[in-house]
């Protein structure tokens, strides 16, 4: 063991830089395999719809190019009882006019107009306040729902009374560029693997804000989304789990999304994600010392070490 004490700081530094990703990769693989064998393997058949209704919330800000497709796919949901609420978050383009037009076409569609842009968190809360049902399915204004996505998410929300939120499995549509194809591999394998392993080991770092289902009772207990946080999806995930609600990852609940295909766009997106994660860690570090929240410790420790490794 003497050699261990003879190492220089640079040796420890480079050892950590190279060995930490390798260690986490094996940890994720082991957790992902366990999740598949324990849960995913037995969930092949599309579940039967429950007797509960749901509200699909779609916050929209300057989505004139995509909102028609988004609403169209939402309306093709293979679930018997649902409503769609589109929230126009003070758009400056033709989003408002398009939504009003679509409301005349689809009887299930309701439109809420906000006078000015308030942000996604505020728009979601506005939609939740006017929704008629206990279960909320939230997607982005440019996301496309798979016809069975709501079935899978409602299956978990209604079957498990302690589940406060379920996160779906986003798939990337735009694959024309090399950057887009790389992100396809990232979302199809790495991100899904991490969520599977986190669910296996205890808690999930964050739901996918682009495709997520909530129990309104759970949201009401924690005060819904905070509009002062950079990434409201990470924040609401942590607060739900602080309130002892479970979060489920549902790989069969598919949604199709558009991702940045330029390095600048990708950099801005990932920078926002990183800032949001750090913001949540700083905001809730003191609460993490509570023994009742010990199941959140692995997620918090992993996040802290990952931030340290990144720097």
What residues fall within each predicted segment?
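Catalytic donor-sugar/metal-binding loop of nucleotide-sugar-dependent glycosyltransferases
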Residues: 237-255
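Acidic helix N-cap motif at the loop->helix transition within catalytic regions
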Residues: 68-69, 93-102, 148
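Short beta-strand/loop segment that forms part of the nucleotide-sugar
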Residues: 81-90, 110-114
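Long helical/loop segments within the catalytic core of UDP-sugar-dependent glycosyltransferases
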Residues: 23, 110-113, 121-123, 127-129, ...
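N-terminal membrane-anchoring/stem segments of glycan-assembly enzymes
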Residues: 1-50
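Cell-envelope/extracellular polymer assembly enzymes that use nucleotide-activated donors
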Residues: 52-55, 83, 235
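Short, acidic, metal-binding catalytic loop of nucleotide-sugar glycosyltransferases
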Residues: 72-81
């Amino acid at each position: 063991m003497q050699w261990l004490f003879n190492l220089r700081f640079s040796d420890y530094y480079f050892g950590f830089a190279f060995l930490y990703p390798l260690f986490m990769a094996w940890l994720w693989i082991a957790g992902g395999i366990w999740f598949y064998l324990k849960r995913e393997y037995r969930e092949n058949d599309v579940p039967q719809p429950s007797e509960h209704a749901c509200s699909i919330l779609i916050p929209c800000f300057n989505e004139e190019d995509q909102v028609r497709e988004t609403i169209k796919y939402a309306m093709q949901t293979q679930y018997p009882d649902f409503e769609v609420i589109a929230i126009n978050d003070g758009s400056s383009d033709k989003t408002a006019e398009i939504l009003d037009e679509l409301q005349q076409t689809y009887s299930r569609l309701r439109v809420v107009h906000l006078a000015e842009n308030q942000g996604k968190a505020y728009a979601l809360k506005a939609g939740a306040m006017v929704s008629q049902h206990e279960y909320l399915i939230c997607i982005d204004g440019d996301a496309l729902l798979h016809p069975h996505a709501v079935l899978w998410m409602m299956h978990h929300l209604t079957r498990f009374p302690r589940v406060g939120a379920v996160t779906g499995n986003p798939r990337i549509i735009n694959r024309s560029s090399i950057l887009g194809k790389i992100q396809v591999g990232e979302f199809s394998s790495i991100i899904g693997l991490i969520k599977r392993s986190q669910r296996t080991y205890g808690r999930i770092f964050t739901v996918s804000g682009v495709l997520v289902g909530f129990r309104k009772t759970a949201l009401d207990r924690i005060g819904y989304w905070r509009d002062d946080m950079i990434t409201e999806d990470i924040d609401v995930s942590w607060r739900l789990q602080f309130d002892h609600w479970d979060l489920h990852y549902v790989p069969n609940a598919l949604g199709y999304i558009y991702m940045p295909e330029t390095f600048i766009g990708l950099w801005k997106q990932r920078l926002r994600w990183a800032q949001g994660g750090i913001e949540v860690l700083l905001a809730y570090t003191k609460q993490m010392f509570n023994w009742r929240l010990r199941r959140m410790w692995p997620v918090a420790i992993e996040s802290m070490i990952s931030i340290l490794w990144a720097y």
